[in-house]
């Protein structure tokens, strides 16, 4: 058992503690058990270890699509977490959602089994590959999915058949949903680097992409300064290059805090020019130039201006077309294309490959259309993500009324960002805020936080119409039915949030079918 998990006889679970010696590999793990194996970040790692021949099993509270997939691969999954599940295991893996009093943690502790955080497993996998990490408050899954897509579809030689560990699923070329984990035979690993618990401090990638460092997860970091300091530290661990978005003020603060050596190998991508950005601390600028004000055709067009000396002696202008709309996706694609070029892929080949990217699951995912009312699902759960989503919606559907059912994620986040959520949601025409998805929190600890926390802030804003554009409805099934009754021909309904609001898509589509003639009125 790791030293950080023994303290005066108690069990300490510290996600920031590194549990493995530098020379250890995944083949030193022995029989490995994942607690909460159906979680997005856990199932990916379990599958990757399984593909590499490690004996893997796990447990979870209930069946899910993730556990179904793992079982189809031959991985044993027990439902219900109990001591017997870890008998005879060498390594037990936990995530930050697991508490020290979990019966499997207690049993593993008593048996002297090695207990490690999921980030320790990912760090082991990285050490054997040319790793590219993607960190940031928003855009991690989409950016890492784009890079994996480029490598899968255009990689040759050592860049072919990459490994990837992505928290969400990916839409393949044919629209099929692919799992976010794969242990490839190539020498590249693309991984999301989750900053929420500080565990990304363990990673030492060749290339570190930082999409943004807007304050989030202050329940862990305490202050914005501490949060950004973690990104400064993470950037310093990249051995070859750092790729950062310059459109985020938090990132610019991180950039200016880097030491000269790290800043000198940093590439900034931005829709702004050098004069607008100001001091870049010696970093190289790649500028993004958008080609149009809308993406009504369904495509996003932009040009990358790559200075000479970065990937060749001559300055390059690379035209890029995306299937997924939004300036935020142009930024995400720029990071992925630059990373692919730094890995050794021809930049034109990389930009051509990203054109066929259909999106990560639950990122502007069109779920269906009935009576010309389109239903779109998105994972956005932070005000900046919601604002970017609704900006993209306006570009993609400039003539449509945009209706949103938003399920807040975490009581603490809802309270802290209530005003910012209201301002972001004001970009829509019609909004219903549902009950809050608690995740790891408990309602009794936040008795004053309800849908009205956001609605009350929103009603202070100037908005047309002034009174009835937003309302709170605790039950999401009721919210879905209400939104269907309000919808008309040509509208777009978005289900938004990181919780189980995605389940309402089918409910909405079936209700639209039942009210087909009303929608056409």
Swiss-Prot record:
Q: Which GO terms describe its cellular component?
A: cytoplasm
Q: Name one GO molecular function term.
A: UDP-N-acetylmuramate-L-alanine ligase activity
Q: Which family does it belong to?
A: Belongs to the MurCDEF family.
The record's function comment reads:
Cell wall formation.
InterPro entries on file: Mur-like_cat_sf, Mur_ligase_C, Mur_ligase_C_dom_sf, Mur_ligase_cen, Mur_ligase_N, MurCDEF_pg_biosynth, UDP-N-AcMur_Ala_ligase_MurC
Binding residues for ATP, per the UniProt record?
Answer: 136-142
PANTHER family named among the record's database cross-references: UDP-N-ACETYLMURAMATE--L-ALANINE LIGASE (PTHR43445:SF3), UDP-N-ACETYLMURAMATE--L-ALANINE LIGASE-RELATED (PTHR43445)
Q: Cite the EC number.
A: 6.3.2.8
GO biological process per UniProt: cell division; cell wall organization; peptidoglycan biosynthetic process; regulation of cell shape
| Name of the protein | UDP-N-acetylmuramate--L-alanine ligase
The reaction(s) catalysed by this protein are: UDP-N-acetyl-alpha-D-muramate + L-alanine + ATP = UDP-N-acetyl-alpha-D-muramoyl-L-alanine + ADP + phosphate + H(+)
Pathway noted in the entry: Cell wall biogenesis; peptidoglycan biosynthesis
């Amino acid at each position: 058992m790791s030293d950080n998990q023994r303290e005066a006889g108690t069990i300490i679970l510290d996600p920031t503690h590194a549990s493995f010696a530098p020379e250890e590999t995944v083949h030193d793990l022995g029989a490995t058990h994942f607690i909460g194996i159906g979680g997005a970040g856990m199932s990916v790692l379990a599958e990757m270890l399984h593909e590499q021949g490690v004996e893997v099993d796990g447990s979870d509270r209930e069946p899910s699509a993730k556990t179904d997939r793992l079982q189809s691969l031959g991985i044993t999954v027990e439902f219900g977490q109990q001591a017997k599940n870890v008998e005879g295991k060498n390594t037990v893996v936990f995530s930050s959602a697991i508490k020290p009093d979990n019966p499997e943690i207690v049993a593993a502790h008593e048996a002297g089994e090695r207990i490690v955080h999921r980030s320790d497993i990912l760090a082991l996998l990285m050490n054997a590959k040319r790793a590219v990490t993607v960190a940031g408050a928003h855009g991690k899954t989409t950016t890492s999915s784009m890079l994996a897509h480029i490598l899968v579809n255009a990689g040759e030689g050592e860049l072919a058949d990459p490994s990837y560990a992505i928290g969400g699923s990916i839409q393949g070329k044919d629209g099929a949903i692919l799992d976010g984990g794969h242990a490839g035979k190539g020498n590249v690993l693309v991984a999301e680097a989750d900053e929420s618990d500080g565990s990304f401090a363990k990673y030492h990638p060749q290339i570190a992409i930082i999409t943004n460092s807007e304050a989030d997860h202050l329940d862990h970091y305490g202050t914005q300064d501490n949060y950004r300091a973690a990104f400064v530290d993470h950037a310093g661990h990249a051995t070859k290059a750092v790729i950062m978005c310059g459109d985020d003020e938090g990132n610019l603060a991180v950039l200016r805090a880097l030491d000269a050596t790290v800043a000198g190998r940093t590439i900034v991508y931005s829709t702004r020019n050098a004069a607008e950005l100001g001091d870049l601390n010696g970093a190289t600028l790649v500028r993004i130039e958008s080609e149009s004000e809308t993406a009504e055709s369904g495509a996003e067009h932009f040009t990358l201006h790559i200075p000479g000396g970065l990937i060749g002696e001559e300055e390059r202008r690379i035209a890029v077309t995306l299937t997924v709309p939004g300036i935020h996706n142009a930024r995400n694609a720029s990071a992925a294309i630059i990373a692919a070029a730094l890995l050794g892929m021809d930049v034109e080949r990389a930009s051509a490959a990203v054109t066929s990217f259909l999106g990560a699951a639950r990122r502007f995912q069109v779920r269906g259309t009935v009576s010309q009312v389109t239903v779109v699902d998105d994972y956005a759960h932070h005000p900046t993500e919601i604002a970017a989503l609704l900006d993209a919606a306006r570009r993609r559907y400039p003539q449509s009324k945009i209706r949103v059912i938003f399920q807040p994620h975490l009581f603490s986040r809802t309270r802290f960002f209530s005003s910012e959520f209201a301002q972001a949601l004001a970009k829509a025409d019609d909004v219903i805020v549902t009950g809050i998805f608690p995740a790891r929190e408990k309602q009794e600890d936040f008795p004053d936080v309800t849908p009205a926390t956001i609605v009350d802030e929103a009603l202070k804003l100037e908005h047309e119409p002034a009174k009835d554009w937003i309302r709170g409805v605790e039950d999401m099934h009721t919210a879905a039915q209400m939104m269907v009754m309000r919808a008309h021909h040509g509208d777009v309904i978005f289900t938004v949030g990181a919780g189980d609001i995605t389940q309402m898509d089918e409910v909405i589509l079936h209700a639209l079918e039942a009210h087909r003639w009303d929608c056409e009125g």
